[in-house]
Structures are given as structure tokens and as C-alpha cells.
């Protein structure tokens, strides 16, 4: 099996794992999951939600996302900052393409590759990542894939 095909298979596995991780989110409008992988090891994870110590309610009475809700990417990157790991040169797998604010965090964290499975309504985050030289890959989430082929 060639290297490119092997990488594509790994990308699909990790994006499925990020999708499963998104199920931990308490947000009702949208559940997003993220994994940071380096040397084929998951070194951090995150999902969208409220900061530590806040009630796990992401939407207000008008069903709008509260302004202090953290995105999955931000949660994964801040976990790295509190650990002994480094995200320099890592790959981020995220179920929705990053917004512009998360793209800035990804760039500053030294992440070199971003794989996502769902398009966000704005493309400015993706454009910024590409402009900074980060490899950006879209892959469809294959929910019918079985690990037992």
C-alpha cells in the first residue's frame, strides 16, 4: 500500500474519532470535535462547550450560542498548553472547518496539517490556514465504514 493511501486511511480513522468525540459536547445547535495527532499518537482532544466551572449550557434562551462557548479547536489547543506536549508539526482533525479565530490559534500552535469533514459557513479560516502554509484537507465522514472489513 502506498504512503498516500495509507495516510488517507489514517485521516479517515482520526476524523471518525473526532466525530465520536464531538458527541461529548453539551451544545444543542452544533457538536464539534477535534483531535491533535503527532507521530500517530493523539496528544490532545477537545469539543465545543463552556469553560471549566460554567454550567454545561451552550445556548441562551433564544437558542443562540453564548459568547463564551469555546470551540473544539481552542479546547484541544489549550489542553496542549497545560501539558508537557508540543503541537509543533502536528495534525489537527476537526469535524467542522475552523473559523478565523481558531485558524489563528492553529497557526500559532505550530500545527502543520488540518483535516476536516464539514464545511463551516465561512471560508476565511480555511483561507488563512492555506495562506500560512498549513496543509488543509477535506475528507468526507464515512459513517458506514466498518473497522472490521
Regions found by a protein language model. Give the residues of each.
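Zinc-dependent deaminase catalytic domain
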Residues: 1-149
Amino acid at each position: 500500500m502506498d504512503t498516500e493511501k495509507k495516510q488517507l486511511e489514517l485521516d479517515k480513522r482520526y476524523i471518525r474519532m473526532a466525530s465520536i468525540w464531538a458527541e461529548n459536547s453539551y451544545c444543542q445547535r452544533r457538536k464539534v470535535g477535534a483531535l491533535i495527532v503527532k507521530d500517530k499518537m493523539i496528544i490532545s482532544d477537545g469539543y465545543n462547550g463552556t469553560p471549566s466551572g460554567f454550567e454545561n449550557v451552550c445556548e441562551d434562551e433564544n437558542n443562540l450560542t453564548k459568547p463564551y462557548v469555546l470551540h473544539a479547536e481552542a479546547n484541544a489547543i489549550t489542553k496542549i498548553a497545560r501539558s508537557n506536549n508540543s503541537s509543533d508539526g502536528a495534525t489537527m482533525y476537526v469535524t467542522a472547518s475552523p473559523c478565523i479565530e481558531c485558524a489563528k490559534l492553529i497557526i500559532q500552535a505550530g500545527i502543520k496539517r488540518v483535516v476536516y469533514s464539514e464545511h463551516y459557513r465561512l471560508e476565511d479560516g480555511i483561507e488563512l490556514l492555506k495562506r500560512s502554509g498549513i496543509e488543509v484537507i477535506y475528507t468526507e465522514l464515512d459513517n458506514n465504514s466498518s473497522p472490521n472489513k
